[in-house]
Amino acid sequence: MEVLKVASDSNPNSVAGALAGVIRECGGTAEMQAIGAGAINQAIKAVAIARGFVAPGGLDLICIPAFTDIMIDGEERTAIRIIVEPR
């Protein structure tokens, strides 16, 4: 599964397009990763926008948030992992 990394300066419309594309092409689940309040805000906005993108095709999306530990520059950080899948 491809992980979409979202930053606080990510454009939510662009992330939503990528998210909708992954869901349509892979026929199921996408995963996003965000660190920090700004990045999480952009990721959640992207889910809301992506719901509008896939709705005409008869899909609705749900997201499942979870914590995950990742390594950045040799340092362990806690990120939010958001699994997005059709309902």
Residue ranges and their predicted role:
Residues 55-87:
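C-terminal edge-of-domain segments
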Residues 10, 35-38:
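Short beta->alpha linker loops
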